[in-house]
Amino acid sequence: MFTFFKINKIAAQLITLCVACLWFSTINAQNNTPKFKVIAFYTGRDDKAHISFMHEANKWFPKMAAKYNFTYDSTKNWNNLNAEFLSHYKVVIFLDTRIDDPAQRLAFQKYMENGGGWIGFHFSAFALTPSDFPQNWDWYHNEFLGSGSYVSNTWHPTSAILRVEDHNFPATKHLPETFKSAPNEWYRWSNDLRKNPDIKILVSIDSTSFPLGTGPKQSEIWHSGYYPVVWTNKKYKMMYMNMGHNDIDYDNKTYKDLSHTLENEYEEKMIIDALLWMGRGSK
């Protein structure tokens, strides 16, 4: 009798152990399942500084995906920018340019209006008429981004002291009041974003940065003014960052990288917090 009960007790313990192992395996599998998917579009041509950033980003984002448990894909095939393809992704990234095809533009607009997430870097907001990138997309440049057309930029790429203007936004709530950026070519825009009620300016260039730029043209050195560099549109789940232009040795024609955008801890933190906010929320 004693042996019978002892065997039953051991069997019960084994069953309990198996159930516990199965439960922990299920939980572990759930935890290892990527929480959301990110797709980055890029062109990878023309400006060596933009190409440098594109390569840097396509090495950095997969590392962050493994660390923060999301999936990162990238493509230079802009034909993928359609409703069916985008339906598999929570966040879209434009690394170095924008869309030109009307059908793709409409697909992106609907994706954003339906709650998709977007992060755009540097040249993705560029528009100048006349140029190869004219301002011929009013929804994107005037409503969505709010910035209008490109007006001018600093040169050479230099670091700036940046001021965080809103600590309530998910991407900036963990940032200090001010921080030093990675070197960048900074843009000025035709529209005053402060006058747009839909735009929330998140980060701007602090006045302690002036003079900003080294020239040689005087117009490439900023001595005063107000320059937003990161903002969001409150109607959409989006964030634009003017960063994304690495410093390249053009002067000596070696074309070597002299700086990298994603070696700045504060800019990295801002990007990751934005991705996690966009990716983990409901679409």
Task: For every predicted segment, state its role.
Residues 1-33:
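Bacterial Sec-dependent N-terminal signal peptides
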